[in-house]
């Protein structure tokens, strides 16, 4: 993980009420989009 991803991680957790596999999937998709 880069510093950018580490910084975005808490943002994703706060943005998504469901913390778990769904968030991991969103993070994976986000990295794919970037």
UniProtKB/Swiss-Prot annotation:
One of its GO terms (molecular function) is toxin activity. The keyword Zinc-finger does not apply. Processed by the macrocyclase-peptidase enzyme POPB to yield a toxic cyclic heptapeptide. POPB first removes 10 residues from the N-terminus. Conformational trapping of the remaining peptide forces the enzyme to release this intermediate rather than proceed to macrocyclization. The enzyme rebinds the remaining peptide in a different conformation and catalyzes macrocyclization of the N-terminal 7 residues. There is a cross-link at residues 11-17 (Cyclopeptide (Val-Pro)). InterPro entries: Amanitin/phalloidin. Belongs to the MSDIN fungal toxin family. This is MSDIN-like toxin proprotein 4. It comes from Amanita exitialis (Guangzhou destroying angel).
């Amino acid at each position: 993980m880069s510093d950018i991803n580490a910084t975005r991680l808490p943002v994703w957790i706060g943005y998504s009420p469901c913390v778990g596999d769904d968030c991991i999937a969103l993070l994976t998709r986000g990295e794919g989009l970037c």
